[in-house]
A protein has these predicted regions:
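Acidic/glycine-enriched connector segments
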Residues: 22-168
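Short, Lys/Arg-enriched N-terminal segments with co-localized hydrophobic residues
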Residues: 4-22
């Protein structure tokens, strides 16, 4: 079904997202401020559902840091009740994040650290992970209200890479 590789230093599975895209549709990732309000839940659901119905998205990537990522993952889990073919993938910045009970019980179809982050300094890992996600994705759903910070930087990078960005 999916081609799976074992990431040498982490001992966890990694999806080859290009194959997923070809075989199962398009990819959408989420970028947003960690202090995002819970009131975004309905807007996130609407935006993600439009990605499924109008753009053919079947795989959603989330980062797992902060409230926005929590809301995004929760949204995809809700969407899976209606669209069981969609996938939720956690792209972690650190291997230690994969051992968290939240990840193990979080309803993710896969969770991994991109192998390109193996030698990245700890403080740069989230920025590098966000760039990796922006490179892999077709679409971005974002919550950015400040022209600063990691979410803003990730969205700007995705735009430079020609990705379609949906701001909520």
């Amino acid at each position: 079904m999916f081609k799976i590789d074992i990431v040498r230093s982490y001992g966890i599975s990694k999806l080859y997202l290009k194959e997923v895209m070809i075989m199962h549709g398009k990819i959408c990732c989420f970028f947003g401020h960690r202090d995002a309000p819970d009131t975004l839940a309905d807007d996130l659901y609407t935006a993600a559902e439009e990605m499924v119905l109008l753009e053919g998205v079947t795989t959603f990537l989330v980062g797992g840091h902060g409230n926005f990522d929590f809301l995004a993952a929760q949204t995809v889990r809700r969407l899976r009740m209606v669209y069981p073919h969609i996938r939720l993938v956690l792209v972690a910045a650190y291997a230690s994040a994969l051992r968290s009970p939240r990840v193990k019980e979080g309803g993710f179809d896969d969770a991994f650290v991109p192998d390109t982050l193996a030698k990245v300094p700890y403080k740069a890992a989230i920025v590098c992970r966000n760039r990796w996600m922006a490179q892999q994705t077709d679409f971005v759903i974002a919550y950015v209200i400040r022209a600063e910070g990691g979410a803003y930087t990730a969205v700007e990078y995705a735009r430079k890479k020609g990705k379609k960005v949906c701001l909520i």
